[in-house]
Amino acid sequence: MKRLTIKTDRGDFSVCFWKGPANAPILHWAHANGFNGQTYNRLLRKLTRDFNVYAWDAPGYGMTEKGAFYNKVNPVLGNSYDLEALIIELNKKHKRKILLGGHSIGGSLSLMVSKYIEEKISGSVSYTHLRAHETSL
């Protein structure tokens, strides 16, 4: 796992990156409330057999600070715009559609974003009852 900073028009986001095969699909994983991207290390590193995996730290979690665009009235809506900006940058970087996944609110954010920018998304997966620290594949 490697930490990266990805710059977007809504600020800088700290993301975890697990490298998979050279031409593997790109998966972005969005964490649940109270977690950060690195929480899912045990799960996501195993997915590198088939994917290049990114997992962000949403604003105010992990290593991403609440930026100028942080929406304290409706943080879920604000985070959906932040995630959209991040996915647009990943799409530009890799020049292909991104598969979105997430746990709990991260899954909901991923579904919201997939509707905003469906032309940049290859699909989405949402998990509600995942205990990431105990997950084994």
Residue ranges of model-derived segments:
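Conserved small/polar residues in nucleotide/adenosyl-binding loops
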Residues: T128-T135
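Active-site acidic short loop of glycosyltransferases
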Residues: A22-N23, R49, H94-R96, E119
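Active-site loop/oxyanion-hole signature of alpha/beta-hydrolase fold enzymes
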Residues: A58-G101
